[in-house]
């Protein structure tokens, strides 16, 4: 197992960030590509559009013997088109870079057709919560996640690791297994204990 780090919190240029990682003994990096993760160390459009740019970017990693373990596009692809587009671009770039793991969040739909605000339901009462959940899962999440999984498979992605974060449709084992049963085992969990702490775990 390699010691790795999610780099988007490191406020420094790409090369300087990699040098810092080497100095700390970090052997692999998870690069944020946009949405909530930010993208301080990668330009999705540039790398998608230029093999030369991809080669130059990857050479920075190779020279330092740092592996690219995952791309992170955490956002809400179930509610916002711009987040869906970044997710789609991230999958396409993963194929071009040979990356097989994506870290992201499940997303959270609105509560009904025509609503624009994501609604996080964590209780079974009052009864209307079940109508909201039925809409979120069966009308939005499962169809869209089937599409995402097909897209991921077409791009050679073998694992989508969902953060167990609050204000997401998938945030605990029960909701993860519900999604896996619907879309298959390509979807798993990126276990972040810090999320459990603030959710009272």
Question: Model-found features: residue ranges?
Answer:
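Active-site acidic/histidine proton-transfer and metal-coordination neighborhood
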Residues: 16-19, 56-63, 77-191, 198
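Hydrophobic faces of well-ordered beta-strands that scaffold small-molecule active sites
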Residues: 3-7, 29-31, 68-73, 102-104, ...
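Short polar catalytic/cofactor-binding loops
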Residues: 7-14
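N-terminal amphipathic alpha-helix/helix-capping segment at the start of soluble metabolic enzymes
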Residues: 1-4, 61-62
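Glycine-rich, proline-tolerant flexible connector loops at the mouths of alpha/beta enzymes
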Residues: 30-58, 109-113
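Catalytic domains of carbohydrate-active enzymes, especially glycoside hydrolases
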Residues: 14-37, 97-101
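The substrate-binding groove and active-site-proximal loops of carbohydrate-active enzymes
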Residues: 42-48, 72-81, 135
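Bacterial c-di-GMP phosphodiesterase catalytic domain signature
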Residues: 201
